[in-house]
Each structure stands twice: as C-alpha cells, then as structure tokens.
C-alpha cells in the first residue's frame, strides 16, 4: 500500500483526539506469540490489496470515464491562472466630474496588426466587454469592477513580451448628446462607429510589476495603481461571430475644448490555482526531522491519514497519501468528500471510518470478516471444499443386468443380494446400514465357494431349500420391501441435505449475472433459453431443404456456416474476419475432399468482401491455408 509511514507518536506533541486517531503499534506491549498472531492478522490485508492491484493495472490502459472526467477537473482546478480585477479608485482632475465617464467599457483586447490599417491607427480584437455603470463609493473607490481570467505566468510571459495584449478603456461621455457620438446601448449590435474617449494599459508593464512582486509567488494578491489619461478618438465596432473588432482612429488635431481627464485605476492580480494550496505543499519530505514531519503533513492540504487496523482492532499501521489519493487504486479524488464516496463504493471488501479534525483528515480501515471468512456449516465443514450432487428431477435407479439375470437363477442367488447400486453415495450407504435391524445382518455360510449369505439362525436345511423358486421369490420380495423403505428414507434425507446446502449458497444467472432465488434454481423451467444444437441443426437443414434454386453443395455450405456462426456466437461485423479464418481451419479438410464446397466458400467470401465485411488480407490467408491442405 503506497503512502508515507508516520513516525512514532511519542516524539510529537499532538492533541488527545489526534492520538486516538493516529496511534502506533509501539505503545502496546505484546508477547512473541501475540506478535506472530498480529502479523498473521495484518497479512489478511494481502488478498483484497492484491485484487485491487490487479484491477488497477487493468484500468491503466483503459481508465473509467468518471475517473477521466475527475482527472480533467483536478487539472483545471490546480492549473495556475491569474484572476485580474479592474476598478476605478478616484480622479485627480477635479474640474471634470468622474461620473461623466460612465458607462465605462473595459476590454481585454489583442492587437490584430501593429501596422495601421487604412485610416485607423490600431485594430484590436476582443471577446467580451465589461461595463462599469455605477459611481464611486466610499473613499472614492468604484463599487463596480471588471474581472478577467488570464493564462498562467509562463504563457502570460510570452503574450506580454509580444506586446499584443492591452486593457482598453472606452467611455461615451456625453456622446448621446453629441452629434459626433454614438449610442452606448448599441455597442453590442452590429457595425457602428462614432467619437468617444479612450485609453489603454499595456499588459507588458503590468506583467513586469507582477514579476517583481514577491506576493505573487506566495499566492497572495498584488495591487497595482495606474493613471490613465482619456483621449478623444473615433472608433468603429465590427462584430464577427463570437469575436469582435474595434478600430481606433486618433485625430491628428484633437479638440482643445475638452481637456483630457486622468483617472486612477487599481488592478488586482491573484493566482487562482495556487490559492487552494498551502505554502508547505511545495516542500519535500527529504532532509526533514521527525519532529517537523508531522507539522508539515498536517499543514499540507490533500494529505489524508489512513489507519489500517488489525488484531481485533488492537493494533494499526498508519500511512499518509497526498492529493486525496486512494491508497489502493491511486485515484485522486480531488477532495475528502470525493474520497468518502469513492472508498465504500469501489473497495467494498473493507470497512471505512472517516475522521475530520482541525489537524487531520483520517480514515480508519478494517477488514470485513463476513466476506473474508468462509461460512461453516453445522458439521464444521467448509461448503466450498465439500462435494455434493444436485438434480432438480428425481431419477430412478436401475439394477445392473447381472442382478436381474441372477434373480432368475435361484441356486446362484444369495439371500443377501445387494439391492442398492454401487453408484450410491457414501451418505446413503451409511444411512441404510444404520436403518437395518441387527437381526437382518447377513453371514456367509458354507465357505467362499458357496457364494451364499444367510441370516443368523438359519439351518442348513433352509439353505438347501433355497433352490425352490417360490421360496426365493418370497424371501427376495420381503427383502426388497425392507430395502425399498430404507432407500426411500435415504433419498429423502439426501434431498434435504442437498437443499440445506443450496440455501447457504448464492447462485447467479449465467446470462444476466443477477442473483437468483432458490425457487428459480429448483424450478424445472429453463431460464437460460438454451438452444439444443441438434435441434437447431435439424431445423436449419429442414429450412434449407425448402430451397429449390440452390444446389446440394450450396445447401451444405450454408448449413456449415450457419452452425458455425451459432455455436461460436458470431454477432458483430467485426467478428467476420476471425470467423472466416476459423471456419477455414475447422472445415478445411472437409472442403478439400469436395472441390465444389471450396468454390462455394470462395464465392461466399467474395460476397462478404463486396459488402465490406471481409478484407483482402483475411481472404488471402483463408485461400492460402486451403491450398496448403490440397498439397
């Protein structure tokens, strides 16, 4: 089981709840015999762990859909991105009211071409525009703000060095009352243009300030204050599907009547992926003292303590997994809640108890004794090791031919002829012997050459009179009656014993793989709907005999193919190439002896090839194999 073993709790100062959650084995003093028994108890974890390891290795190449989705979610959650927030923090020029700037549009735009396009000085492309409509709040800080999600620092460095990204500020101050302005409510509709105020902040300068700040590496917020000067310009908006373009034309002689306004803007940046990680998450466990190891493990988010209890929950082994990982299948569950759902549903051979405190997230693991220990019946015999026979229909036992023949020959028949077959099970023989009265046991009289058995107290004269057929029939009839009663009781007891054994076992349907009730198991109805091959072949031949426009060889070939497809369960189109090669190897010797069958088979493969069910390579392999058989 993977994980980081914890040190002894005697060297750490933990609370009482933590001690109860993560105590070690070293505190319990046990003898050598108890230590051996404890090791055997701990070894019981090997079987379920080996099973889960096999399942985990099989799932490496083809992981489950839910685990793939969870993996993508975890990657997106821990991906380092920058959350940028832009808002107005005040105005320096008191001559012009800041309220006139609203509504103010803030765009994160990319420069399409650094060269001027026609009469426009710059063309930017953006996806969405944030609108600030409210005024300044307390201390001159705007209550409305614009949020943008930037890529990670490495990718942002390339974008910043290129100088293509910039934050645009566009205001239609007084544009609705001006003959040169445009309606701010129509900025999202179609191609429009007009006069406005604008300014920009290159992202390159912001990235330089963020890179110098030590708070960015620690996952803390970085605030940058900038002064933007709103300049008059003429813009034209053009919408193209999801992306929009804004073309800006700065006049060579701007109007002097309207003085430019400087606005103080605050830009906050914070890494989203790193805020959920502790600063201790970047530390490694190497070169760390034992006393400091527990403190770092405690502060690391995503670390879960697993306590494996054994020896009647008196001892336990403790280990730690990272990133909310499962210790059995190594699946990262993204959170402790996800781990709580994953463990009971996926690893049902174990019991799990979840603990959450201010210092630790722990899981107590124990074995399910009802699944690991096999059930024992009344005779202390494991039913898995005991062989028994069951039949839903009672069958009649027949005497062997030698016994029937000897019943007609009186002198060669002993009074103690065996009625039960030798195929009776040992339980029936023992029960029959226990049911026969002591006076009915037979003794051998007259030596081994006589071959006759008589009950005790029988005189030799009576033995000599056994040659009488009437006497033999009367004695045999009474003996048969006695043994028939004993045999009936034995069979009934055997059925009861087999029924009790069946009740302790769980049977599953061979097709649906669903548990079956005992009534379904004992019923005479065939729930599997199995088709007898002989009956199916007979019906197939009868159906083919009705065809009048095909030859005898074609009928035989169709019958061979239908029988092969039914027995081998060829159901999908992808099974056809394999089925053709297997059919050629199975029926190749028969087709070689009858050349007409080979031609019928080749014509059939050509038809499959015309329908796209068989490739040329497989057809060539089949013909090559048949040619080798002909040689």
Swiss-Prot record:
PROSITE patterns in the cross-refs: ZINC_FINGER_C2H2_1 (PS00028)
What GO annotations for molecular function exist for this entry? Answer: chromatin DNA binding; DNA binding; DNA-binding transcription factor activity; transcription cis-regulatory region binding; zinc ion binding
Tissue expression, as annotated, is: Widely expressed throughout the life cycle with higher levels in proliferating tissues. Expressed in both vegetative and the reproductive shoot meristems.
Stretches for region Disordered: 424-465
Q: Where is the composition biased (Basic and acidic residues)?
A: 424-446
Function, please? Polycomb group (PcG) protein. Involved in flowering processes by repressing unknown target genes and preventing reproductive development. Participates in polycomb group (PcG) protein complex-mediated (probably in complex with EMF1) silencing of the flower homeotic genes AGAMOUS (AG), PISTILLATA (PI), and APETALA3 (AP3), as well as of some regulatory genes such as ABSCISIC ACID INSENSITIVE3 (ABI3), LONG VEGETATIVE PHASE1 (LOV1), and FLOWERING LOCUS C (FLC) during vegetative development, by mediating trimethylation of histone 3 lysine 27 on the AG chromatin (H3K27me3).
Family membership: Belongs to the VEFS (VRN2-EMF2-FIS2-SU(Z)12) family.
Return the protein name: Polycomb group protein EMBRYONIC FLOWER 2
What is this organism's lineage? Eukaryota, Viridiplantae, Streptophyta, Embryophyta, Tracheophyta
